[in-house]
Amino acid sequence: MPTPDVPARIIPAGELFQHVSRASYRGTALHFGRSGGSRFDDPALRFGTLYVGFDLSTALMESVFRQHRWSRRAKRAITRTEVYSRMVRAIGVLEPLSLADLTAPGVMASQFGLNLAQLASRRYAHTQRIAALLHELAEPDGAHRFDGVLYPSRNNHPAACVALFDRAAEKLSLVDDIALRDHVDWPSFLSNYQVVVLPA
């Protein structure tokens, strides 16, 4: 594949990301997974990836509710046990991040020959190939071009999500681990997305 011409989206210092995690990981370092089982993971497992959102709703829809079947169910629900088992990691940006912007008009088709269905597919061959390619791109001085990927949310359109490469770790800070039930935006998520909390 020819070297793609992908625009960069610069995320300034001071931005705050959100990542939904298991409460059992409270206080641990940020984890950049190398399972090869997520959308922009490296298929060769050479680098790790951390998936974050800019808001709680997108972070939840891309994690806890990523395989929902709401169109087939009369009620949208989550158990109290599940709520209590989750926390939100507030992640601060210490230095500007350069993200490969796959949300820019025409980029998916012109640079990678992909449509939205392929980008959002649960078969990750295309997106993992793109991640590996973007990870290796460098500037003329040899510096890495991108710290991660900005891409359309599959489950919370038209929001965008971020896949951060592990080399971005030094530009990030774990600000706080917040119990999901205590998050300031949790009540509005339940209301806006019509989700009920079941007692069991």
Regions found by a protein language model. Name each.
Residues 1-33, 39, 71-200:
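Active-site and NAD+-binding cores of ADP-ribose-processing enzymes
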